[in-house]
């Protein structure tokens, strides 16, 4: 696994590695260099979600060993290389869609983007959602991911 993991560092652009480092650091709540079940619990809790231990354990089992940054990169490298990015994006939005409506409150999404991770500015927010499918304050993330990935598919 170490060979595969170190190969990831040479495959990904530096900017992407830096973005992944920021994501890893955000998830690694106790800053010990590893993502464990407690880190995941805290992260999801800060997002207003409470997945059970079984779900969290399943996530962690994707790694063949302790989930340090190199392993984190290794696991996500295929997704980052574009193999299933539309699905990955849709799934990321779906994590916040507890009722599975395929739509999210646009103000909630904006709040997350302003206050978590990269902390979008008002201008970045305006540009991101300029063409976004928003009706009645609801952001249609399935249409949005199809639109930005160019598949033209409206349904999963």
From Swiss-Prot:
Keywords: Calcium, Metal-binding, Motor protein, Muscle protein, Myosin, Repeat
Blocked amino end (Ala) modifications at: 1
One GO CC annotation: myosin complex
InterPro entries attached to this UniProt entry: EF-hand-dom_pair (IPR011992), EF_Hand_1_Ca_BS (IPR018247), EF_hand_dom (IPR002048), Myosin_RLC (IPR050403)
Residues that coordinate or bind Ca(2+): 28, 30, 32, 39
EF-hand domain: residues covered: 15-50, 84-119
Family matches, as PANTHER family: MYOSIN REGULATORY LIGHT CHAIN 2 (PTHR23049)
Miscellaneous remark of the record: Smooth muscle myosin from the scallop adductor muscle contains two kinds of RLC proteins, A and B. The calcium affinity of the smooth muscle RLC is approximately 10 times that of the RLC of striated muscle.
Protein name: Myosin regulatory light chain B, smooth adductor muscle
């Amino acid at each position: 696994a170490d060979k595969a993991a170190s190969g990831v560092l040479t495959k990904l652009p530096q900017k992407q590695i830096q973005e992944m480092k920021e994501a890893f650091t955000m998830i690694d709540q106790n800053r010990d260099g590893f993502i464990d079940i407690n880190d995941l619990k805290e992260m999801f809790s800060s997002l207003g979600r409470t997945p059970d231990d079984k779900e969290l354990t399943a996530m962690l089992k994707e790694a063949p060993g302790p989930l340090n940054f190199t392993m984190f990169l290794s696991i996500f490298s295929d997704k980052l290389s574009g193999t299933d990015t539309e699905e990955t994006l849709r799934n990321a939005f779906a994590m916040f869609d507890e009722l599975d409506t395929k739509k999210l409150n646009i103000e909630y999404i904006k709040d997350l983007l302003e206050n978590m991770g990269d902390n979008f500015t008002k201008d970045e927010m305006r540009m991101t959602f300029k063409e976004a499918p928003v009706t009645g304050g609801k952001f249609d993330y399935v249409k949005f991911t199809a639109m930005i990935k160019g598949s033209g598919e409206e349904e999963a």
